Amino acid sequence: MSGRGAGGFPLPPLSPGGGAVAAALGAPPPPAGPGMLPGPALRGPGPAGGVGGPGAAAFRPMGPAGPAAQYQRPGMSPGNRMPMAGLQVGPPAGSPFGAAAPLRPGMPPTMMDPFRKRLLVPQAQPPMPAQRRGLKRRKMADKVLPQRIRELVPESQAYMDLLAFERKLDQTIARKRMEIQEAIKKPLTQKRKLRIYISNTFSPSKAEGDSAGTAGTPGGTPAGDKVASWELRVEGKLLDDPSKQKRKFSSFFKSLVIELDKELYGPDNHLVEWHRMPTTQETDGFQVKRPGDLNVKCTLLLMLDHQPPQYKLDPRLARLLGVHTQTRAAIMQALWLYIKHNQLQDGHEREYINCNRYFRQIFSCGRLRFSEIPMKLAGLLQHPDPIVINHVISVDPNDQKKTACYDIDVEVDDPLKAQMSNFLASTTNQQEIASLDVKIHETIESINQLKTQRDFMLSFSTDPQDFIQEWLRSQRRDLKIITDVIGNPEEERRAAFYHQPWAQEAVGRHIFAKVQQRRQELEQVLGIRLT
């Protein structure tokens, strides 16, 4: 451990006979040599008055308070002494990481200006790289180029024109998207032709073992003979169907009833019915097989499966509105148009409708509310009429016309509806647009940075001296903001501010810290430990 003089400067190792080391270690000091201070003067006033304590070297105040401190350098005669007068120097009063130590003797207890204290704000953890990138993208500037850049680069006007066109295009696409969303909510159908094929085959009776296939005798058949029977097929398909996926025939109907001749098959076996159930599997056709060798008259009742459901109006209301079979929403719309056209809405109480003579006959009242119309209308709606087809099942082998074709109108989903749904559900274009927007934002940000660098260099080349001074003032302001040091510029510009007691102590601390730093550097270079 090196010796330390009264001024606080670290000293090289003294000779074995020196008394500074002993005084620093708390040993009894050697007799004072010529020109040296007496031994008791090296001891501090103790815990009550100084920074030193038992076993620690004391520091005497210098300057007007006492004689100038002197220390002896190695290799110098005792008579050659170097006085150290002026500022107080020495180690800081206590460890910077420990409790505050009392002030050195002769110094009034002053406190540091609270405005110069650094506020310790808890530092938040830095965001992750992915979060930082996302935050940066959210805080990016708009895609519009600043006016200064547009004035500097006239060619950038083409980019601004494209940006204006893109804005109009985005508005148009957004409006069309909303229109598509509204259109999908409504039933979007188109009428197509469904061709129904009704055919039948006849299997004559055969005797068992008859390989020639001749018919049995009219008088009767043996016990092992095969009974004559016929089979009816009902199939169909859409005409000019552009879709690749063919729709099943049964999916067009809600129910199918085949009514056979009641006189031939009796009251219990003359009806063949099929009704759609939640668990029904779609099929391409229907087959009915019955025994018999006579021509049979049959009636086919086909009930279409309308989506949304359609209803048949009361004949009186149908003639009045001009609507026979339609959806509930279409019927309500036609009814409102009739009320509006004939001015049946009450002029004062707008929720009431004044019935004319036709409405009085249909609704059996002279006045009704709007809210009562759905309830009144429910009793006037019926299920739509089924499609009726009369067909004769022929068992004559010479009859070549055993297949009949019937065309009916059906409503199918418009292919455009599927394209609309795919357009709304597709996110490929949105992802591509978002990626391009990110690139545009990054490019604009890079352009702004380059513009800032250009202005920096241009200002420096125009007037280097004023630029450097202004830049230093800016850096000083930024440094105060970064280090959280808030000072008073008006006080700091005056010399009296730096003659306060805290300034002398701060200088001593600073010099001591610098000496310690240089000492550590010297030890590292020499590879030794100075003791």
UniProtKB/Swiss-Prot annotation:
GO MF term list: transcription coactivator activity; transcription coregulator activity
PROSITE patterns: SWIB_MDM2
GO BP field: chromatin remodeling; nucleosome disassembly; positive regulation of cell differentiation; positive regulation of double-strand break repair; positive regulation of myoblast differentiation; positive regulation of T cell differentiation; regulation of G0 to G1 transition; regulation of G1/S transition of mitotic cell cycle
Domain SWIB/MDM2: 306-383
Phosphothreonine carried by residues: T217
Sorted UniProt keywords: Chromatin regulator, Isopeptide bond, Methylation, Nucleus, Phosphoprotein, Transcription, Transcription regulation, Ubl conjugation
InterPro entries xrefs: SMARCD2_SWIB_dom, SWIB_domain, SWIB_MDM2_dom_sf, SWIB_MDM2_domain
Localization in the cell: Nucleus
The keyword Chloroplast is assigned to this record: no
Positions of post-translational Phosphoserine modification: S203
Modified-residue entries (Asymmetric dimethylarginine), positions: R81, R104
Main subcellular location of this protein, as a coarse class: nucleus
A UniProt-annotated Pfam family: SWIB
Glycyl lysine isopeptide (Lys-Gly) (interchain with G-Cter in SUMO2) crosslink location in chain: K226
Organ and tissue specificity: Isoform 2 is expressed in the pancreas.
GO cellular component terms attached to this protein's record: bBAF complex; brahma complex; chromatin; kinetochore; nuclear matrix; nucleoplasm; nucleus; protein-containing complex
PTM annotation, UniProt: Ubiquitinated through a signaling process involving RAC1 and the RING finger protein UNKL.
Region of interest (Disordered), ranges: 205-226
Record text on subunit structure and interactions: Component of the multiprotein chromatin-remodeling complexes SWI/SNF: SWI/SNF-A (BAF), SWI/SNF-B (PBAF) and related complexes. The canonical complex contains a catalytic subunit (either SMARCA4/BRG1/BAF190A or SMARCA2/BRM/BAF190B), and at least SMARCE1, ACTL6A/BAF53, SMARCC1/BAF155, SMARCC2/BAF170, and SMARCB1/SNF5/BAF47. Other subunits specific to each of the complexes may also be present permitting several possible combinations developmentally and tissue specific.
Disease: Specific granule deficiency 2: A form of specific granule deficiency, an autosomal recessive disorder characterized by recurrent pyogenic infections, defective neutrophil chemotaxis and bactericidal activity, and lack of neutrophil secondary granule proteins. SGD2 is due to defective neutrophil development. Bone marrow findings include hypercellularity, abnormal megakaryocytes, and features of progressive myelofibrosis with blasts. Some patients may have additional findings, including delayed development, mild dysmorphic features, and distal skeletal anomalies.
Family of the protein in this entry: Belongs to the SMARCD family.
Protein's job: Involved in transcriptional activation and repression of select genes by chromatin remodeling (alteration of DNA-nucleosome topology). Component of SWI/SNF chromatin remodeling complexes that carry out key enzymatic activities, changing chromatin structure by altering DNA-histone contacts within a nucleosome in an ATP-dependent manner. Critical regulator of myeloid differentiation, controlling granulocytopoiesis and the expression of genes involved in neutrophil granule formation.
Protein name in the entry: SWI/SNF-related matrix-associated actin-dependent regulator of chromatin subfamily D member 2
Organism: Homo sapiens (Human)
Source lineage: Eukaryota, Metazoa, Chordata, Craniata, Vertebrata
